[in-house]
A protein has these predicted regions:
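A metal-dependent hydrolase signature that marks the N-terminal structural subdomain at the beginning
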Residues: 2-19, 23-104, 232-251
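Pan-zinc metallopeptidase signature
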Residues: 34, 38, 195-257
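N-terminal "first-domain core" detector
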Residues: 100-110, 117-120
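Post-HEXXH active-site segment of zinc metalloproteases
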Residues: 106-114, 137-176, 198-203
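Short pre-active-site segment immediately N-terminal to the catalytic Zn-binding motif
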Residues: 113-126, 169
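Active-site recognition of the HExxH zinc-binding catalytic motif
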Residues: 125-138
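An active-site-proximal "capping" alpha-helix that borders the catalytic cofactor pocket
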Residues: 173-188
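Substrate-binding/catalytic groove segments of enzymes
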Residues: 186-198
Length: 257
């Protein structure tokens, strides 16, 4: 995996600008360069509803991927804040629900994941993405620096992370795509603005083309086959925790309704 290649960050007008890497069927060869990159083709807000409808139409004959897509699309327009303290706390709680340790420190101090804890002095979307990395990584790689994927853009102790890299570039690319989509679906589950990460990570690049929907459908189907999401596109792990969280949120809405 080239240094700096990660889907742990992105860029959208509602977020501070920050490095991003790309996935998707139309990512150019330049995306393999170690320099972090941004959204390939930003979609204007007034065009986004049309783009979402077109993607949904391309997925119409595939119920499971369509259900996952609808969960993400439903987070547009973004009703509340972005990267709020509450959202960061949600990400930390999600990690703890999975038994993942966290450390309130910037990943630039050493590693994003050191084999034991996620460093969580980062944006909420990055915390959730890192939990998804843990879920997507083979159990034997969870004890490795950066999950054996090599150094990410935040990693400062790069030689150590590189020494523990076990995955080829192609394997890293595939796992990053799986992680990206799972993290986005977890953001939707948490009530976070999942659509922003979906755009930042270029899942909507070339949205007019059926191939973009095919790319999404393939990864959604694989997450389902792996037991990481259900037929409705909802993340399948720590279900008791997420059900209780939903019930508590509904109770608050009812009390204030």
């Amino acid at each position: 995996m080239p240094d700096g290649y990660s889907i742990r960050s992105g860029s959208h007008p509602l977020r501070p600008a920050r490095p991003a890497a790309q996935i998707g069927p139309d990512v150019p060869q330049a995306a393999t360069d170690p320099v972090p990159l941004m959204i390939l083709t930003p979609i204007p807000a007034d065009i986004l509803p049309e783009a979402l409808e077109r993607m949904a139409a391309h997925l119409a004959d595939r119920p499971q991927p369509l259900a996952a897509f609808h969960r993400i699309a439903a987070t547009w327009p973004v009703p509340g804040g972005v990267d709020t303290p509450e959202q960061r706390a949600d990400g930390v709680a999600l990690a703890h629900a999975h038994g993942i340790g966290t450390l309130d420190e910037k990943p630039s101090a050493s590693f994003m994941w050191d084999g034991a804890v996620i460093r969580v002095d980062v944006e909420a979307t990055v915390i959730v993405h890192e939990v998804a990395h843990w879920l997507c990584a083979a159990p034997e790689r969870r004890g490795l620096l950066e999950f054996g994927l090599g150094p990410g853009p935040e990693t400062s102790r790069r030689a150590e992370a590189r020494a523990q890299q076990t995955q080829t570039f192609q394997q890293c690319m595939h796992e990053e795509a799986q992680t990206s989509l799972l993290g986005i679906l977890w953001e939707a589950e948490l009530g976070h603005p999942a659509i922003l990460a979906f755009l930042e990570q270029n899942w909507m690049e070339a949205w007019e083309r059926p191939g973009t929907a095919d790319w999404f459908a393939g990864h959604a189907a694989e997450l389902f086959e792996r037991g990481l999401i259900d037929a409705d596109g909802r993340p399948a792990t720590v279900r008791d925790w997420s059900d209780k969280r939903r019930a508590d949120a509904h109770g608050l809405e009812t009390a204030h309704g």
